[in-house]
């Protein structure tokens, strides 16, 4: 019995999808009965692709014996034929693939007046989500984002294996990564290209900017942020916005660190927010002059040395230094106030 015409509803134009038939209305590898690839035209109407049907008549038509079948439809949203299922049962899906599914069970395959069987009402559902990153530059001398690229980690494992009995993609692991690009930046607010990502339950993502140029400042691999409690549902549309401000405040000819210095383990860092402070004499924020030790009474009365300067150790080393008397006086003389604090201090 030829099973060639199919009737789709609101599907994408110029895409190919594969149909897999399972006899006895049971979706198992043992009940595999055949497969064929169909292609939609510019109006979204589908027709069989030549030489893709198994089993097939001499004419190339897809042929199935009369009976009750379950049909599984899948596509990657492209104009290329989806690969046949491995073992007539499973395939893989990766990030940035527009994987779509449809399943119809209890289909009575029998001849109509034309001697064929029509599969009607095929409507695909997207199984991946769409994700876009947005970068907003603030408080730089020039806020134009000229170059931008990033890597997102913590996504669902990729590839993921899907089998024909599943109506959705499984959610597995947190080892997936995605490279994100910006085709046309050159603005203070720039949106990345849109990407497909596998669905995921709530988790924390890490976004590392591998390439970043704001104004004249090149900051490759210098900024990494976390996005918490991120859920990506099938067919959802998501945008993560990252605001980037300089980690310094310009006062006359010097750049002063925006955040307080603290020590964690053997490394030195600046606080993420200007108001943050590691309280307590031994909790990392109490740092003496010219020493890498922390705590009350820890200081070095000898000559200044970059090897002993905690500011100098902040990654990348050599970017910062403890201010000299002259530099501190320069800030005081500038008459700068911040949030109502005394002149020259904040």
PLM region descriptions:
Residues 1-140, 191, 201, 211-213, ...:
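Short, low-hydrophobicity acidic/polar segments
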Residues 17-19, 71, 148-152, 205-209, ...:
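Hydrophobic beta-strand residues in large extracellular and virion-surface proteins
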Residues 31-53, 161-185, 225-228:
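Solvent-exposed serine/threonine-rich low-complexity stretches and specific carbohydrate-binding patches
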Residues 48-60, 180, 189-192, 257, ...:
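Generic recognition of long tandem-repeat/solenoid scaffolds
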Residues 100-119, 123-192, 203-204, 339-340:
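Short helix-loop boundary/capping segments
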Residues 152, 180-227:
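Extended serine/threonine-enriched, polar tracts that run as long, contiguous segments within proteins
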Residues 215-251, 319-320, 337-344:
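Hydrophilic extracytoplasmic domains
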Residues 245-346:
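Conserved positions within compact, well-structured domain cores
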């Amino acid at each position: 019995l030829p099973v060639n015409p199919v009737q789709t509803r609101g599907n994408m134009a110029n895409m190919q999808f594969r149909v897999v038939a399972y006899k006895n209305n049971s979706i198992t590898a043992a009940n595999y009965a055949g497969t064929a690839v169909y292609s939609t035209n510019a109006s979204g109407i589908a027709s069989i692709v030549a030489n893709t049907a198994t089993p097939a008549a001499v004419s190339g038509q897809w042929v199935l014996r009369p009976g009750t079948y379950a049909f599984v439809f899948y596509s990657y949203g492209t104009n290329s034929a989806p690969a046949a299922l491995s073992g007539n049962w499973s395939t893989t899906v990766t990030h940035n693939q527009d994987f779509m599914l449809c399943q119809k069970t209890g289909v009575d395959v029998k001849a109509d007046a034309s001697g064929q069987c029509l599969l009607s009402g095929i409507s695909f559902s997207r199984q991946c989500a769409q994700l876009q990153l947005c970068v907003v530059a603030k408080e730089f001398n020039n806020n134009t984002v000229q170059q931008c690229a990033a890597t997102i980690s913590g996504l669902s494992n990729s590839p993921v294996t899907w089998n024909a009995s599943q109506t959705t993609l499984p959610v597995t692991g947190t080892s997936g990564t995605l490279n994100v690009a910006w085709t046309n930046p050159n603005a203070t607010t720039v949106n990345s290209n849109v990407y497909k990502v596998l669905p995921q339950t709530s988790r924390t993502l890490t976004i590392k900017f591998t390439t970043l140029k704001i104004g004249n400042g090149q900051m490759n691999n210098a900024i990494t942020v976390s996005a918490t409690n991120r859920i990506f549902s099938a067919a959802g549309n998501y945008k993560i916005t990252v605001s980037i401000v300089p980690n310094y405040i310009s006062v006359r000819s010097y750049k002063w660190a925006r955040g307080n210095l603290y020590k964690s383990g053997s490394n030195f860092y600046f606080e993420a927010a200007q108001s943050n402070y590691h309280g307590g004499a031994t909790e990392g924020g109490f740092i003496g002059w010219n020493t890498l030790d922390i705590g009350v009474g820890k200081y070095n009365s000898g000559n200044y040395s970059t090897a002993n300067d905690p500011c100098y150790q902040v990654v990348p080393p050599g970017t910062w230094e403890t201010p000299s008397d002259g530099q501190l006086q320069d800030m005081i003389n500038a008459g700068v106030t911040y949030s109502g604090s005394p002149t020259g201090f904040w």
